[in-house]
Structure formats: structure tokens, C-alpha cells
Regions:
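Short acidic capping loops at alpha-helix termini that bridge into adjacent secondary structure
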Residues: 95-99, 285-288
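Active-site core segments that coordinate phosphate-bearing ligands/cofactors
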Residues: 1-62, 73-89, 110-292, 296-380
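Nucleotide/phosphate-binding loop and acidic/charged catalytic motifs
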Residues: 63-69
């Protein structure tokens, strides 16, 4: 499949990877007894949203939305349709794929197997990060959000322009609303919150991730220790499968506080690298970073993110922004909400840059030098 990597990337915006559903579908068809002999119209191959819609409607609807379809590696994000060359390449029939709809379409009706006394409309379907982008109010080109979790998703709305990445990001569809699609650039990072779990479970340096803030604030400001959390290689924007995790630059006085701080800094520095790649790819000057997820409760991390990016970082007042975004889309689809009136700044916490430019450049420079040492990545 490797020789088709460029073809797949050009049509789908995604790098060839078994992470995406196309490879999984091909495997299922080859390894499920009788699957290849069945009429393709008797098979349903799709993402989790299409399965849920199928079950909730008792098999009456097999549908998906643009955001989920665009992550299958079978969907052409330029023609906005299943791509014959791609699904034949993976041995999948178009007859087995879900109908692609706007994210705020009427997907079907359900009573949730009798939970409701009457059927209600299913008016929304969207990918997790895509829904969070919408829930954050990032509805226009140039707006950007980061969801912090075990890993992190950084996503920029590029509006109706499909921007091809030259700096290690993927291009995808944000959503389709009322007949109009928006595109995104996205960078996914494997180890962010998971670094704190590693400190707790394997090194026993902290008893909970919440403790990391106090340790980081108590660290020696002169210490330059850098932690590269490449436990399974490095993802966006570096994409190195061979990189290994390292703690670099320790001295005799480096202790627990300094290592914990380096781990926290690795989260912010990885995200900063993706933000820089997004500005280069899009030629858009980012104005603000909207953030959500559990680690955003760490004020040290949020202030550092603001300092490194030289951006105001706005922490959402609502944790479940993916659910909120999907609910907003459903409300628009049902005609009870107006998109222009959705987003509110109420409850947000705002962090503004405070770090000197000299200190900022030194931290980013030390990080980039460490990246070069572990994977030979070209870093500006």
C-alpha cells in the first residue's frame, strides 16, 4: 500500500496509516468468514456514528456526516464523495458505505428502544474534535482550539479553503452545515496528559496529575532539563517512528521538581510546534487559542502555553465541549438555534503572555535542539 501514499494523501488529506478505518475495513473483509462472498449491499462498513445511527433507527438509516467520512481514507475531500479509486484500492464496495450528510441533517428518528414514548429526531453527527471545535465557537477561518487529554488535538478552521499541509499536519473536513462545508488543519499529539500518568504510575514522582503544578512552580528556574516524551515515536508535526524518549540536559542539581516541570513543558512545547506549523501552512496569523480538557485546570501549563505561543489562551468554562458542539449542531438543524448567537465567553478563564522574549526563545531553542538529537527532525 505504501506506493499509494501520495495518492491517498492528495485525495483525503490524511497520511497512509492503519489508524484510519479504510485499512481496518480491508482487514475485516479479508478475515471475516463469508464477508467477501456476501452481496455488498448486505454489509454496512462505517465509523461509530453510522453504527449508532443504524442501531438507534432500528436499521432504517445508515448515514454518516462529512467530518466522520473524511477520516475514513475512502472519502475525497475535494469532490465531497466516496472515491472509487480509493475504495477499490482497499477492496471496499461503495454499496457497503454509509450515506454522507451534513452534520446537522435529519439522520433519522428514534425512541431509543422504547425509552421515549414517541420518536424524536436525530439531528447531529460529528467527530469528537470537530464537535469540540464547533462547541468552542471556532466557526470562522483562522480560529483554533486545542483539546488536552491523554493526547491532544490541535485544530484550525480554514473556512471553505482546503489547505494542504507541508509541515506535518493533516487536512480534513470540519463539518457540513446547511449545504456548506468547512475545512480544518489538525495536528494530533500522542503523549500530553499521558506524560503525567507516566510520572505517577512508573516513576512515582507525583501521586496525582494535579500535584504537578506545585512541583513545577517550585523547580529551579536556572535548570534547563528537557523531556521528550517519544514513548511511541513522535507524531505531529515531526512524524518519527524511530525517536526514543529522553530526558536531556540534567545536572547534579536536577531533581523531582525539575523533571516534573520538564514533563509539563513537553506538553506545551509539542503544542507550540503544531501551532507554528499551522501558521506556516495556512499563512493565517493566529489571534487566540481556545482550549478545553482536564489538563487545562493546571494554571502553570496554561500560562506557559500562553507565553510560548504569545497568544491569549482562553480556557472554556464547560468541560464537555464535544457534546456541546454536537448539541449546537442539532439545535441548528432543528431550527431552534441560530449559529450567530451560540458562543458565549461567560465562564472562560483567560491567560495572557508574560514571559520575556529571550526566555521564550531559549525554551523553544532547547526543545528544538533536543528534537534534533532524538529524531533528526528539521526544526526551524
Amino acid at each position: 500500500m505504501a506506493p499509494y501514499g501520495d495518492l491517498i494523501r492528495n485525495k483525503t488529506g490524511l497520511m497512509l496509516s492503519p489508524f484510519f478505518p479504510a485499512a481496518k475495513m480491508a482487514w475485516l473483509l479479508s478475515n471475516t468468514e463469508g464477508a467477501k462472498e456476501r452481496d455488498p449491499e448486505d454489509l454496512c462498513l462505517g465509523t461509530i456514528d453510522s453504527w449508532l445511527i443504524y442501531r438507534m433507527t432500528r436499521g432504517k438509516a445508515f448515514k454518516t456526516d462529512y467530518s466522520n467520512a473524511s477520516r475514513t481514507q475512502l472519502f475525497n475531500i475535494h469532490t465531497l464523495s466516496w472515491d472509487e479509486e480509493l475504495y477499490e484500492l482497499f477492496g471496499v464496495s461503495a454499496k457497503s458505505l454509509a450515506q454522507v450528510c451534513d452534520s446537522n441533517s435529519l439522520f433519522g428518528m428514534t425512541d431509543l428502544d422504547g425509552y421515549f414514548d414517541h420518536e424524536i429526531p436525530i439531528h447531529s453527527a460529528a467527530g469528537d474534535s470537530h464537535a469540540a471545535l464547533f462547541g468552542q465557537g471556532c466557526h470562522s477561518a483562522g480560529m483554533i482550539k486545542t483539546t488536552y487529554g491523554t493526547g491532544s488535538s490541535i485544530m484550525m478552521n480554514t473556512g471553505m479553503e482546503c489547505v494542504s499541509s507541508r509541515h506535518g499536519l493533516v487536512t480534513s473536513l470540519a463539518w457540513g452545515l446547511d449545504g456548506q462545508v468547512n475545512y480544518v488543519l489538525e495536528g494530533n499529539i500522542n503523549y500530553t496528559g499521558a506524560v503525567m500518568t507516566w510520572l505517577k504510575d512508573e516513576l512515582h514522582l507525583i501521586s496525582s496529575p494535579a500535584e504537578s503544578e506545585a512541583f513545577a512552580k517550585a523547580a529551579n528556574p536556572v535548570d534547563k532539563t528537557v523531556l521528550i516524551p517519544a514513548f511511541s515515536g513522535l507524531s505531529a508535526p515531526y512524524w518519527s517512528d524511530t525517536a526514543k524518549a529522553v530526558i536531556y540536559g540534567m545536572t547534579r542539581t536536577t531533581g523531582k521538581n525539575e523533571i516534573v516541570r520538564a514533563a509539563l513543558e513537553s506538553i506545551a512545547l509539542q503544542i507550540q510546534a503544531v501551532l507554528e506549523a499551522m501558521e506556516k501552512d495556512s499563512s493565517i496569523c493566529i489571534k487566540e487559542l481556545r482550549v478545553d480538557g482536564g489538563p487545562t485546570r493546571n494554571s502553570y501549563l496554561m500560562q506557559l502555553q500562553s507565553d510560548l505561543s504569545k497568544l491569549d489562551v482562553a480556557v472554556a468554562g464547560i468541560e464537555e465541549l464535544s457534546a456541546m458542539g454536537a448539541a449546537y449542531m442539532a439545535g441548528i438543524g432543528a431550527g431552534i438555534l441560530n449559529q450567530s448567537e451560540l458562543f458565549s465567553e461567560e465562564g472562560r478563564t483567560l491567560y495572557s503572555p508574560q514571559m520575556t522574549e529571550e526566555e521564550r526563545k531559549e525554551k523553544i531553542g532547547n526543545w528544538n535542539e533536543s528534537i534534533r538529537l532524538v529524531c533528526g527532525a528539521t526544526v526551524q
